[in-house]
Each structure stands twice: as C-alpha cells, then as structure tokens.
C-alpha cells in the first residue's frame, strides 16, 4: 500500500476541476451551476446561487461547504501536493490555518503560507523509508521462513530418533532396575546381620557393666562379708526409703529383699538390684577428682595484689592449727552428707561406644556392588527422563502455531527487554511477559502465553499473555503484544492503557507484509 500512495501524491498537482469552495473532487458532480442544488441528505432543493451564501439552508449543511454558516458542515481542504483533508466548517475563516494550502482562511485577513509541498516532500520521504523497511524486512522474513523449514525438518528427524531410542532406553532401565534389586537383597541381609550382631554385642556389654555395678554394690552392702546381704545391712542405706519418711524400716528392707531376710549375690542381681539401682548411693567417695584447669596464658593478666611478706614462725603455727580445725569440720560435714550414687564407669567417648563398627569385608563388598548397581540404574533413569522431556519439547515446538509459514518460530527461544525510568520489561515470546524494578527486586508476571488475537484478516498481528500476578484488589495482569514490521527484533514500547492491562509493541521482520512491485523510474519508460 505504500508505493501506490507515493504514486498518488504527485498526481494531485495535475488535477484541478472547477467546483465551489470547500467541495471535494469526489462530490463536485453534486454542485452543477446550471441546475438547482439539492441538499445531499435530500432535505431541500434551492437555487444554486444560494450555495455558499453564508446562510444555512440544508439540514446537513451541504449548501455551505465553503462558509461557517452551518454548524454541522464540512470544509474540504484540497491541499494540492499533500493529503486532502476535511475540517469542521466552523473553523473556516476563524483566523487559524487548518489547511496546508491556506484555503480555509480566504476571508479572515490571515495570510496562510502554503506548506503542502514541503509536507508532501516529507511524507514521501517517510513513505519511502517505510517502503524500504518493508522491502528489507520482507527479505529477512523469507530467510526466517526458510530457516524454520530446515529447522522443523531437523527437529522432526530428531524426534523420530528420540522416539525410536526411547523404547531401547526403557528396556535398559528395567533391566538395570532388576539388577539393582538383585544386588540390594544380599546387601540388605548382610547389613541387617551386621546390625543385629552389633546390637547383641552392645547389649551384652551393657549387661556386663550392669552386673559389675551390682557386684560392687553387693560387696559394699555385705558388711560382714558372709556372702549375703541382710535386712540389717540394707538398712544402713536410708536413701533406699520407699515411703518417704527418710528412714528404711525393717519391713521396707525385707520388701526390697522380696520378703527374705537376706539374699545372696545371684538373687541380689536378679531381684534386688533393679529395685534399688536408681536410689543406691555408694559408700566410697570419688577418688578421681578433676584436675584444676590450667590458666589461659593468652588472656591478659589482671593486676595482682602485692605479695605479702613471709609469715613468722608464730603465724605459721597459728595457720597450721586453723587448717587442721577446718579439715576436721569439713570431714564432719562430709560424713553428714549423703554419699554419691554408684554410677557406671564412663567410657572415654560415649559416641565411640554407641557407634556401629565398620562393616566386614564381605558386607562391604555387597554394599559396593549394590551401590554400583544403583548408580547405573539412576543414571539410566535420568537419561530416560531427559529424553522424555526432549520429546515433549520437540512435539510442542513442532506443533506450535508460528504463523502462516512459521516466520515467528525464531522468537520461540528468545527474550527481549526494554528498560524504562522505573522498570525493566522482559518479553519471552510464546512463554511469558514480566517486569521488575529497575533498581532491583523480584520480577512480577504480566502474563503467560495465551493465543494470537489479531483480527480475522491479520490474525498474527497481536499476541495475548494472560493470568499474570494479581493486582491489589484487581484482576490478574495481562499483556497485549502488537507486532510491527521492522528490520530488527526489539521491544519498542510498553504502556499500561488500563489498570493491570499492558500494551507492548514488538518490532520484527516476521511482521512485514509482502511489498508491491517497485514502480518504474522516470528513465525506465517504453517507446511507443
């Protein structure tokens, strides 16, 4: 359409038909000076000399095309050398030049410069540039179409190969699954046996430790060392009191001995020790006291008080007497305090004691074999999942509607950005649109791919992206993308015409229409 417009512009200079002021060339036949004038709406017929007499006779204002008499009239600007234009008749002779040829101000006293020629020149240059963009864009579009044809064939070939290889890989995965399960069975049995043996050993060690504690307690309780613990001997430990009165009565002691008056070592361990274990306190004082911690030499030393002078002999004797009295008082206090509970000897490292020992050589061999089988199975399973994903992606891309000839296919794996004063807008065609603050922050979805929404005659001129992030107390964000012809691919503008509804323009060669044949130049003429 651009080149025909270029051809029409110079033709305007050659056409000049006599007609009343303000009448267009297409309507001049309605204004015949030799006949009465009939209003264009048929509302009246008047003598022709009443046309443009500055009095409105027709309801549609058609009798006053060149004056401002009718409020609903229209004045036609011829604008020779540029584009014709209709203006409301109330702008005629209003002192403002609306027509580039100045014909609307013929009787206002205003002198209008005729700018039509210059405007026509600029218009032709603009149209020529647009025509050049269209030609170059369409040339690139044909390349895009050919590229997609080749790429589509390659993708279809790749899809067939993947679909054929999928069955083989599925069989391999199932085979490796069987191998894995077979390798895991002896591994599981060997690990369970190792666990069981370790737990048995741990239980035996704890039982041995408990028996040693009971033996020590029995030895302490057997004051007369006759090989038995009697009620009287048990009563020497009031902490075993069962009724809370602070003393162990004979009846309570006999109850702890299961009704007997005495018990030997075997019965003591089997029946008595469990009942008194938690309350029993050893008569022996702990001998291994923790050594005082060494001073931290790295810490700054506090200011020390002055060292006192050496004491005299009399002072030393007094200090020794005071220390002896203090020791006697401490011994009396210790005798009154309850003895510490009998506790098992602590291992050097409890974590080491509870830690299961390493597997034996045969068990470790089963574990290594099972792990190798698992690794091979998991690797094959990952390969199968990757292949299935590749198949899905190829099927989706091959079947996607990329335009009449696939010219928009090259946009499928691309993203384009436009930075404004506040935001960075990102368009990934056929996938999503988003925005994020220019100074940093999380992106906000402006919609995901919906469909082509151009008019019926130009379906592929607009895209719709829907179901973006919801607005506060509003709808989900959505974006319409208009596709414009251009030699390059770029987002040229983004606006928000309505709340949460965005409009984006994408320039692309794929949107360029086929241009008409180029008009012959002045030198390219045929001889008659």
From Swiss-Prot:
It is found in: Endoplasmic reticulum. It comes from the Eukaryota. Pathway: Glycan metabolism; N-glycan metabolism. Its main location: endoplasmic reticulum. The keyword Disulfide bond applies. Residues 234-266, 281-357 are annotated as: Disordered. Disulfide bonds join 39-58, 56-70, 77-99, 97-112, 100-116, 415-428, 471-500, 485-512. The keyword Lyase does not apply. Residues 247-258 have a biased composition (Low complexity). Ca(2+) 2 binds at residues 91, 94, 96, 98, 104-105. This is Glucosidase 2 subunit beta. It comes from Homo sapiens (Human). The gene is PRKCSH.
